Design a protein with these regions (language model features):
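Short, acidic Ser/Thr/Gly-rich low-complexity loop/linker segments typical of extracellular
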Residues: 44-56
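Surface-exposed, low-complexity/disordered segments
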Residues: 87-227, 232-233, 239-324
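Bacterial N-terminal signal peptides
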Residues: 7-17
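A short, solvent-exposed loop/turn motif at the edges and junctions
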Residues: 69-81
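Short Pro-Gly-centered beta-turn/loop motif in secreted/extracellular proteins
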Residues: 56-65
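Short amphipathic beta-strand segments in non-cytosolic proteins
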Residues: 30-31, 37-47, 73, 103-108
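Structural motif
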Residues: 21-35
Length: 324
């Protein structure tokens, strides 16, 4: 009996000692925790924080001289060099570019992330074709005008709005902004969706290749990417990449929490300067293309894709869901 008690106390002591050696990283965006911010050690992304902005390194996983940085919504913290002794480190993400934006749609559980456009007009990025309300600001200092818009994200199959005829996403405001023209310059943006789901890749591959969810097709240096809308009712969005030999490269999902696949709610966004050339890669995913915002409401262009297995009924359902 005494031996069992001794072993229990010893194991408890070892567990407490091991936990005490862990290093906790806290990421803040202003005075608030930066939900699901990404943590970088020596330039490599190790994962993301929890909903309280916390990330924990196991004992020995970080050493003196390692550089730490956090990133969320295209914004980054200053680089902090670990001194080898601290048990906790706080990384502060600069939030100056995010002022003034707030999503007011009632069924959103939280404001995920913002993308800062040119002229510092932030907005919330959501699923293609989904409408929601967004507060935004235009102007600077005393000339700031705060508006609330019915905001729709549209895709552009026709490529008619792109100067270089590349893939373009159209962001369109609705009619409830007093017909004011709200437009921005074309800017480069790489939108990275989801979290790599290798453990579910084969299961999703069967659904994706059946074409039941196929909506958008992208080409890049790695092969073909398919952007899919899950028609099961949870408004999810899946990005699947296949190589030239039709081998599966990546599977990612953005949308509501999906218990069936055990998926968290992730949206990765990176906005880069116009003069940036080459793809941005995060965890093996990359997208190429430009985006433009326009003040004129436009329809989603849902067009046939070559060799698409979608039936006429599928296309009819897609058009009813996305064409306004």
């Amino acid at each position: 009996m005494h031996n069992k008690l001794y072993l229990f106390i010893l194991s408890l002591f070892v567990a407490i000692s091991a936990a005490a050696q862990n290093i906790e990283i806290t990421v803040k965006l202003g005075n608030e925790p930066a939900e699901y911010a990404f943590i970088f050690k020596n330039g490599c992304c190790l994962g993301n924080c929890d909903s309280l902005g916390r990330f924990e390194f196991q004992a020995g996983a970080i050493e003196r001289g390692d550089s730490l940085m956090a990133s969320v919504a295209g914004l980054s913290s200053d680089v902090v060099v670990y001194d080898g002794n601290a048990r906790s480190v706080t990384l502060n993400v600069k939030s100056g570019e995010l002022a003034g934006a707030k999503v007011v749609e009632k069924n959103l559980k939280r404001v995920d992330e913002y993308v800062s456009l040119v002229n510092s007009v932030p907005f919330e990025w959501r699923v293609f074709g989904r409408r929601f309300l967004c507060e935004y600001v235009i102007g600077e200092d005393s000339e700031i005008s705060r508006k609330t818009a019915d905001f729709t994200i549209l895709d552009n199959y026709g490529k008619r709005y792109s100067k270089d005829k590349g893939d373009v996403l159209i962001y369109s405001f609705g009619n409830n902004i007093d017909d004011e023209k709200v437009g921005y310059d074309i800017f480069s943006s790489y939108v990275i969706l989801g979290k790599i789901l290798n453990r579910h890749s084969e299961r999703l591959k069967d659904e994706c290749t059946s074409g039941r969810m196929l909506v958008h097709k992208l080409s890049d240096d790695a092969g073909i990417s398919y952007l899919l809308i899950d028609k099961s009712g949870d408004n999810s969005q899946i990005l699947v990449r296949f190589g030239y030999r039709k081998e599966l490269l990546d599977v990612c999902l953005e949308g509501n929490r999906n218990e069936e696949y055990g998926l968290e709610h992730y949206v990765w966004k990176i906005t880069i300067a116009q003069n940036r050339k080459g793809p941005v890669r995060i965890s093996g995913i990359e997208l190429h293309g430009n985006m433009i915002a326009t003040g004129k409401p436009k329809d989603v262009l849902v067009s046939e894709i070559n060799d698409s297995p979608l039936t006429k009924a599928d296309w009819k359902e897609l058009k009813m869901a996305f064409v306004r």
